[in-house]
A protein has these predicted regions:
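Catalytic Walker B motif of ABC-type/P-loop ATPase nucleotide-binding domains
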Residues: 154-157
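Helical segment within the ABC ATPase nucleotide-binding domain
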Residues: 169-182
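Short, charged/small-residue-rich alpha-helical element at the C-terminal edge
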Residues: 225-300
């Protein structure tokens, strides 16, 4: 359904996407996981024909994104990262406008309106102005809009960005339901680990390159080590002691000393007894997708976001000096 080969996108000196390769099967939920600035939104913009690639090739639903962009657009739905609803129209008016743009047959519009509004539980608000909606309701309406023309592939670019945890959970309930009912292929980008767990397969992207691909279960099992987080009085000393005494590479992330080790339940008590710096707390967890990201990149996803931001600022500064 989606095939990408050696895809490249450059913005001046900045190579946002660096020769990525992947494919997505029909009916699959595929996730692009990575920090802000990793190349996720750039890739999805190319697949949706918003951007033209600098190199390589990509096809969606059998249509090449460069040679047949209109064919791609007819076959996809898109939920943008930023809100794009007209807040001075009602929910129904927004959907009808979208149906006109995609030339949905007039005889099908009323039925499809009922279906998508019921799916996202907004039937009772169809005549309400969008400006009266909460953030979660607007997101649900955007998902409904993306489904109005019955696309083969639905692209979701950071579908729950800016929403609180409870609303995020509700949005994912709707997404999982629509996948079951519509039998649609989903392609989503996210930097939330828990969202990626909803996918059949994920690709982890960092600095424009895919560093790992597989199901969440397979990727987590491949790490094979538990995660330990220490809150200590002297993080620098603890990191040095872990390196010199136990041959363990640890990182400082959000004030915690973080590292991976096999048999953490046995090693943890021993470490507390032997570590020279005072320990305020210790947390042991089974491998997560955050650990997978750290295993492949040497950083947590939050640290990677900070690095990506610095990288983009530096690139802009170089262009500004010319």
């Amino acid at each position: 359904m989606v095939v990408v080969r050696e895809l490249v996108k450059r913005f001046g000196d900045l190579e946002a996407v660096s020769g990525v390769n992947f494919s997505v099967a029909a009916g699959e939920a595929f996730g692009f996981l990575g920090p802000n600035g990793a190349g996720k939104s750039t890739t999805i913009s190319i697949l949706c024909t918003v951007l033209t690639p600098s190199g390589g090739s990509a096809s969606v639903a059998g249509c090449d994104v460069v040679r047949d962009p209109l064919g791609v657009r007819r076959r996809i739905g898109l939920v943008f990262q930023d809100p794009t609803l007209d807040e001075y129209l009602t929910a129904e008016e927004n959907l009808r406008f979208h149906a006109q743009l995609y030339r949905v047959p007039r005889a099908q519009v009323a039925r499809r309106l009922d279906e998508v509004l019921e799916m996202v539980e907004l039937s009772d608000r169809r005549c309400s102005l969008v400006r009266t909606f909460s953030g979660g309701m607007k997101r649900r309406l955007e998902i409904a809009r993306g489904l109005m023309h019955s696309p083969q592939v639905l692209f979701l670019d950071e579908p729950t960005v800016g929403l609180d945890p409870q609303t995020r959970s509700h949005i994912w309930s709707y997404i999982n339901e629509l996948r079951a009912r519509e039998r649609i292929t989903l392609f989503l980008t996210t930097h939330h680990m828990d969202e990626a767990e909803n996918c059949d397969r994920i690709a982890i992207i960092d600095h424009g390159e895919i560093v790992a691909t597989g199901s969440p279960e397979v990727l987590e099992a491949a790490v094979g080590k538990d995660r330990i987080e220490l809150h200590v009085d002297d993080p620098t000393g603890a990191i040095a002691e872990l390196r010199d005494r136990y041959d363990i590479v640890a990182k400082l992330s959000e004030g915690f000393v973080v590292f991976q080790v096999a048999g953490a339940e046995e090693f943890g008590p021993r470490l507390l007894a032997e570590l020279h710096t005072a320990t305020r707390s210790i947390r042991i967890a089974r491998p997560t997708l955050d650990d997978v990201f750290m295993a492949y990149t040497g950083r947590t996803i939050r640290d990677a976001e900070a690095s990506a931001s610095d990288h983009m600022h530096a690139a802009r500064a170089r262009r500004g000096r010319r």
